[in-house]
């Protein structure tokens, strides 16, 4: 909202994302407020987009082609000095650069964020060097604990993951971006296939009283003996996806794979495919 205030209370949606990106990329901030990933029109923050919608629902913003402040409140005065200086720096340096000119500026400076753009050929006359991505079949695992949706998706993009396999029993999260519907749509728009395999999850009722590593080990031993034994067909389907050349990532909540049942799944799959899992 302070960014909108700096730009006279109104910005086109694409410009808003680009200016916010530049504030994070080129100026010193008190912390990383938003992460960005390469999307349809360059750097994009799902979290920032969600925040805009939330503020619109509260009546503080209006959203159309442009994002507009509804009230002339001094949001800048609420910021730390370093953050206020960053936003004012973006305005001073880029206020005359808008629309396609702003997109071209960002694409030229930060080609990583242009790799998924639908309009890259229209914006840039010259070719830019895009990051080279691994294409060989691989197996990964990733937890979203401690990650924003943008950081999480950026990790998948960086590893060129083609299939994301959700092994949660109940794919619902209070954390924005990680409930099934939102995660499905986000990955789909990035060209990543999302598959939910609830049969590989653990019932919530069995996750009580897990206080020590030994508690988790006992739970996962039981999981192997009961669940993995009766889901051999599902595990074979994962192996088949790998054999087709996909770069697979198994996902759940816990960041540390030792405290997540996906480590037992990957252990089983490793024996079948002769490949070591990279835990992201």
For each feature predicted by the language model, list its residue ranges:
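A short beta-strand-loop structural module common to alpha/beta enzyme folds
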Residues: 19, 163-172, 196-198, 279-280
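Short, surface-exposed acidic-centric catalytic microdomains
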Residues: 174-216
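Short, acidic/polar
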Residues: 145-156
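Short Gly/Thr/Asp-enriched flexible loops that form oxyanion-binding sites at enzyme active sites
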Residues: 179, 259-270
């Amino acid at each position: 909202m302070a960014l909108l205030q700096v730009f006279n209370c109104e910005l086109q949606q694409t410009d808003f994302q680009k200016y916010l990106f530049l504030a994070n990329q080129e100026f010193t901030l008190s912390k990383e407020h938003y992460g960005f990933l390469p999307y349809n029109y360059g750097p994009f923050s799902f979290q920032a987009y969600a925040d805009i919608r939330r503020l619109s629902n509260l009546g503080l913003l209006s959203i159309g082609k442009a994002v507009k402040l509804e009230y002339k409140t001094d949001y800048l005065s609420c910021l730390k000095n370093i953050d206020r200086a960053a936003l004012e720096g973006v305005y001073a340096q880029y206020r005359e650069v808008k629309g396609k000119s702003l997109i071209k500026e960002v694409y030229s400076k930060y080609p990583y964020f242009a790799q998924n753009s639908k309009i890259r050929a229209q914006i840039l006359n010259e070719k830019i060097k895009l990051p080279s991505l691994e294409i060989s079949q691989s197996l990964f695992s990733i937890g979203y604990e401690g990650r924003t949706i943008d950081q999480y998706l950026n990790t998948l993009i960086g590893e060129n993951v083609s299939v994301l396999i959700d092994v949660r029993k109940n794919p619902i999260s209070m954390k924005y971006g990680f409930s099934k519907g939102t995660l499905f749509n986000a990955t789909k728009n990035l060209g990543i296939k999302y598959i939910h395999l609830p049969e590989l999850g653990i019932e919530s009722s069995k996750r009580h009283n897990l206080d020590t590593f030994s508690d988790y080990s006992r739970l996962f031993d039981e999981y192997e003996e009961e669940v993995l034994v009766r889901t051999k067909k599902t595990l074979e389907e994962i192996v088949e996806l790998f054999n087709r050349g996909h770069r697979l990532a198994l996902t759940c909540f816990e960041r540390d794979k030792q405290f997540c049942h996906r480590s037992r799944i990957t252990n089983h799959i490793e024996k079948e495919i002769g490949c070591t899992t990279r835990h992201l």
